[in-house]
Amino acid sequence: MALVGRRDGRNFGYGRQLSYAGPQALRDMFGGGHYGTVKAHSDRWQAFVRWCRSDDGPGLNDARQVDRQILADYAAHLRHLVDRGDLSIATAQNRLSSVNRTMAALRGDQYVKVPSPSKALGMQRTTIRTTAPQGQDREHVMRIVETLSEQHSRAAAIAQLARATGMRLREAILADLARLKHEAEHYGKINIQDGTKGGRSGASAPRWIRVDDHIHEALRFAEQISPRGSHNLLAPNERYLDFQREIVRPARDLLHKHNIKGFHELRAAFACERYEQITQHQAPVNGGQCYAVDRRLDCEARMQISKELGHSRIDVAAAYIGGRT
């Protein structure tokens, strides 16, 4: 048993820290097995812990104080992140489900939980994009990049990388720029690996993107403003969370002023552009009718785009380019 105190003690006997207690309770619940499941729940639990400690959270460090209202507040926080474009619906629902599972492991009952994560978030998981992504106009994006460069050059590099390569925010921040530049120059394609999400194949799954002039330019700019002694956009002594707070958040506000909801929109714009390159038809969300004309080609494009975006399922492409119509 991982219990370190009385069952009715702090964090139900699993220690003084909320961040430690959750994973310990999960290990007990799964009997020391199901490593991948425990790891996934534990990672999502840490996101809940960070929110609890944040200015927006309840400021607690004891699972005994977590009640249904706190979970409802957390659901509202996640819903806000989804609305802002910072989090996918699936990720938000997974986080709520993992908090439910971890609370059950800590408490030993199902009394404190979010009854329906999808209802709590007020949205359906199977999302299909119905509005064209912002940031498809490259000239508009480059004007934003120039504006960002005046105050936050590294945020400008992130925006340019996201639009050129379809990288996620974390991937753009942690990308090994020297390696990518070498691959671009020698192979004509780059393999996005750093900062990727886990999933079934993890960060080792090949994710090659064909290089064009836009990618070459984005990599040159990012490498140029990369901090001294760093191989990515983080300074050697800089924490990722500090970078998000001090650089990304102000940059996101500027994106909003230029009618772009977030960096994720630039990723979707990349996907729509790739669909048009592959099929010679506009993306469905832009009014394209490739599916009606050539279903096989539409399917091939969706699979290719899904892989380039770092997903393993073809249906995920609909969240970026629209459904089959």
Feature roles, as predicted:
Residues 1-33:
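N-terminal DNA-binding module of tyrosine recombinases/phage integrases
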Residues 139-169, 296-299:
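Basic, Lys/Arg- and aromatic-enriched nucleic-acid-binding interface segment
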Residues 210-279:
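Active-site/catalytic core of tyrosine-dependent DNA strand-transfer enzymes
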Residues 24-129:
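N-terminal core-binding DNA-recognition domain of tyrosine recombinases/integrases
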Residues 55, 248-307, 311:
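Short, basic (Lys/Arg/His-rich) helix/loop patches that form interaction surfaces
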Residues 174-218:
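Conserved tyrosine-mediated DNA breakage-rejoining catalytic core shared by Y-recombinases
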Residues 152, 161-175, 273, 277-282, ...:
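A short, glycine-centered helix-capping/turn motif at helix boundaries
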Residues 124-143, 199-214, 227-231:
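DNA breakage-rejoining catalytic core of tyrosine-based enzymes
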